[in-house]
Amino acid sequence: VLDISAATIGKIADEYYDFGEELTPNVVVTLNGKTLKKGVDYEVAYRDNVKPGTATVTVMGIDQNKGEVSSTFKILPIDITDADITLVKDTFAYTGNAINAEISKVTVKRNGTAKTLTDLTGLTYSCGGNVNVGKAFLTLTAEDGMGFANTATATYNITAASIESAEISADSAVYT
């Protein structure tokens, strides 16, 4: 019979947010210098292990083993500063009104591995500098606590309107 409450859980490395998936890192549990076995000596439960913040791991004795011990690990947000933002369209003709670009896709890196987001939950975007001819920008901003951090920017162009296909009409009048 083991008293798991006297056991030690080894340091659990920080993890990055995993796009809404539960993070369940492996743990090393020792008691009196002996490494215990998951499924034989104990079972593991996780709490608050999806969004950024502090997650809890609880190790509980099974069968005749009793007691429990807990530890924590941090879930870090994914930094979007270097995200690759692809716009549906990146060149627009001047209209005299604000022109807002639309996002086609966003690719971020988690632990150095690129991931294209299919859901932009936790991210908002706004456009600026988007009335006059020149460069306009779209800023993607991470919402607090939603898995991402910081901002990313994409630029797009507003070009002079062409008058080649313009139709001009005027009331008939005599000018002197």
Which residues does each predicted region cover?
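Solvent-exposed, low-complexity, repeat-rich "mucin-like" stalks and linkers
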Residues: 1-34, 79-113, 159-176
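Serine/threonine-rich, repeat-prone extracellular segments and beta-strand-based repeat modules
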Residues: 33-71, 112-150, 154-156
